[in-house]
Amino acid sequence: MEQEQNRAPETPPAGAPAELPFGEPLLICPGLYRVRVPLPHNPLQALNSYIVLGDETTTIIDVGFNHPACEKALDKALESLGRTWDTVEIVLTHSHPDHTGNLDRIYRDGMRVYANLHSFKEVENLMQMQANVFGPLLRKAATPQQSGLVFRKGKHRLHISAELLPLTCKPDLIYLHEGDVLRAGSFSFEVIETPGHDPWHICLYEPDRKLMIIGDHVLERITPSVSSWFPAYNALEEFLESLGKMYLYDVDLVLPAHGTPYTGLRERVMFLIAHHGERLQELYDLVAAGHDDIVSISSHAKWRYENWNEWPLDQKFFSMGETMAHLVHLVCEGKIKQTICGDEYRFELP
């Protein structure tokens, strides 16, 4: 197409800026574009939406927060590509609000929405479990200034920020599962279930072009969070098994949800496996040293940022979820044991 021929390739020439403005499509290969969508008030700063052009359809993969800036970016991208919303179908790599929230703004009646979910009710049920388990923990971890923010009145979920509230639109979902082939334009994507970062995470592999749209599963410079929101769910085991799947695919270019496209998928997978091994050992050592509850263990673990007590409440929330995931994995391996004390879970050596 003429629009594609007039656009810059994914790798910019020497001296060019590393990133284009939000909402400006960047050609990856004929028919496939990357669009940076802003994530206001979020350290990730941007989401990569991928747009696939077909003769009559426009497929958008991941859509951003429920925020006007996210809607504006996708509006700009479609206008630039000469497309309109009535041609759009949506594919979600997973349920997190930086990938799904914008549905509340862009969804139109009859729009096809694909996901590894039967219904968004599954996500709401998980949010309720989060509130039940982590509400007391967040109250304990909160500073006096943060304590009033733990719950939003009338909402059965933790109040972290407005962008993280549940979807109000309830589209019927077209269920994608392992081995399905999703056809978009001239592309045929194999669906790969990769739970761990999210129970409903999928990656999309295009074998002819050796491309992997990988969502948040394997990011080049960021370690994806892996959280357990209740102690019976071994999210880390699922994540490590999902990482192992990546060795099965011949991938020349990885298209992540955050950061720029990259190469070297298998090397990055090896790094992540080693990273989680080190984290497991660190948390085992903290339990052995007498730290026995989620808040104490989380606050003494090594994180990228110093002074855990002064962190924003949402960062404490995610750090405790990640701590829980590693502790549950250690319990499943028989290296530590778990007990219940009141409304808290305690951990100790066998």
What residue ranges belong to the model's regions?
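Conserved beta-strand hairpin/beta-sheet module of binuclear metal-dependent hydrolase folds
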Residues: 22-85, 203-215, 220
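Metallo-beta-lactamase
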Residues: 58, 65-68, 158-173, 181, ...
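Active-site HxH/HxHxD metal-binding segment of metal-dependent hydrolases
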Residues: 66-71, 77-182
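Active-site/pore-lining binding-face segments in mid-to-C-terminal subdomains
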Residues: 73, 81, 95, 99-100, ...
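Histidine-centered divalent metal-coordination motifs
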Residues: 93-99, 197, 258, 326
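Short Pro/Gly-enriched beta-strand edge/turn motifs at strand-loop
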Residues: 6-7, 30-37, 159-165, 185-187
